[in-house]
Amino acid sequence: MFLSFCGKVPRNEGAAFVAPNATVQGDVILKAGSTVWYGAVLRGDDGQLIIGENSNVQDNAVLHCDVGGAVTLGRNVTVGHSALVHG
C-alpha cells in the first residue's frame, strides 16, 4: 500500500515489488528491482528513505527516521525479517 504523508508521495522508480499488506508512506524512493515483503512498514514521514537497486526489505521489518534523518540502503542489501532500521 502506498500512502502520501504531508504532500510527500512514495516513488517506485523501476518495477519494485511491494507486497499487498506492506506499507510504504511518505518520502520513500524504491529503486529498480527492490522488494518490500509482507507486513513491512517503510515510513518516510519525518525523513527520506531510499531503497537501492535489487535490495529487499523482508517480512515485518520497519524502516523509519527522526526529523531531518534519512535511511539509505545501497544496492543488493537485505534487511532481515522483523528488523528495525532507524535513521
Write out the residue ranges for each language-model feature.
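Extreme N-terminal tail/first-helix region
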Residues: 1-16
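Left-handed beta-helix
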Residues: 14, 19-20, 25-26, 31-32, ...
